[in-house]
Design a protein with these regions (language model features):
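Active-site nucleotide/adenylate-binding loops and adjacent lid/helix of ATP-dependent enzymes
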Residues: 40, 50-185, 225-229
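Short hydrophobic beta-strand that contains or immediately precedes a catalytic carboxylate
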Residues: 94-95, 246, 264-266
């Protein structure tokens, strides 16, 4: 049987949604009102709204330079925009779907000559971002209930890495890795798969900090310090309509994180998972304790702000948006994998 870390998402998350339903009953809260925990964001940021709009809800000083490339923009104009952005901010740069999840469809552009080749892949609206070239990535979970802000969890994202043996190629070692999935083709194509790494040489494979894309997550909540909390609270508390979610951040090293010196690559909302629960050294019971505690916090934050005005679609429209967005994202991801 697979370790619970690798269970299908719907199976693993079922108890969370059942408990969240109980919390809604307890507070007499319509489930749709869970979005009101983050009433400043499109439906609380449940994965159907613009990541660019979410980013703009915060002070931009910690975020990468970002522009929006609309899907309907002609390819020739996209090429001009990308080159102008690269001239201003340098290469590499990142392109990622504006409505996306788990690292699907993300493209790293390190060479001007490859810009023309990626244009046919950009069928949905994309974010054009400066690449934050810092080696360590963390998820930092934030919650604010009854005026009390907290960092409820931290996880480090350990990027898939192979160790050379002087015999096998990068491609062979990657496909023998216990965390390997077909998604790895997203970044293996940017490496020389035929190269044979020297014995004990470490080769980092990925640039996407996603569990689905092969990252191992560890529970590093003990890294929280007053300095880190102050930096997180300064960013998040300034937006009263954001009370529950995870910041994905990059830092120079652990000491920098503890000092509150980080860059935010993405802010996530009510659909955020407390990813420190995925630590493979922990137990299933421990993971669910973390998960259900965050269900409680989400329901309490939403109940606190239940009277805030917020445009919420009918369930039918939400379901249609989710289905359409997932279909477009999966199609885009397959295009990127097949390029």
């Amino acid at each position: 049987m697979k370790h619970w870390e690798f269970w299908p998402a719907r199976l693993f998350e079922a108890p969370y949604y059942a408990y969240l339903g109980l919390m809604c009953l307890r507070h007499a809260l319509p489930p749709k009102f869970l979005a009101k925990a983050n009433y400043a964001l499109d439906h609380g940021e449940i994965g159907i709204g613009s990541k660019y709009a979410t980013q703009l809800a915060f002070d931009q000083s910690r975020f990468p330079a970002t522009e929006l490339l609309e899907a309907e923009t002609p390819d020739a104009d996209k090429a001009v925009r990308i080159r102008e952005f690269a001239a201003q901010h340098g290469l590499p740069l990142i392109l990622k779907p504006d409505i996306g999840a788990v690292g699907k469809g993300v493209i790293k552009v390190a060479d001007d000559a490859k810009i023309e080749a990626i244009l046919p892949l950009l069928r949905c609206t994309y974010l054009l971002q400066d690449y934050i070239d810092l080696p360590n990535e963390y998820g930092v979970f934030y919650a604010r209930v009854r005026g009390r802000s907290r960092v409820t969890g931290i996880n480090q994202k350990h990027f898939p890495t192979i160790t050379g043996n002087g015999l096998h190629t990068v491609g062979q070692l990657a496909r023998a890795h216990y965390r390997y999935t077909a998604h790895w083709d997203l970044f293996l194509r940017d490496l020389d798969e035929s190269r044979v790494p020297a014995r004990d040489e470490q080769v980092r494979l990925s640039f996407v900090g996603s569990h689905t894309m092969g990252c191992k997550f560890t529970n590093d909540t003990a890294l929280a310090t007053p300095e880190l909390e102050a930096a997180v609270f300064k960013l998040c508390d300034a937006q009263p309509g954001y009370n529950f979610g995870r910041l994905d951040v990059r830092t120079r090293d652990e000491a920098a994180l503890r000092a509150g010196d980080f860059r935010v690559i993405e802010a996530n909302g009510v659909a955020s998972l407390p990813t420190h629960m995925f630590d493979p050294s922990g137990s299933l019971a421990g993971a669910y304790a973390i998960f259900l505690e965050h269900a409680r916090l989400l329901a309490e934050a939403a109940n606190e702000h239940r009277h805030q005005p917020m445009a919420l679609s009918a369930w039918r429209n939400i379901a249609a948006r989710v289905k359409a967005n997932q279909s477009l994202l999966n199609d885009t991801h397959q295009r990127v994998l097949s390029r």
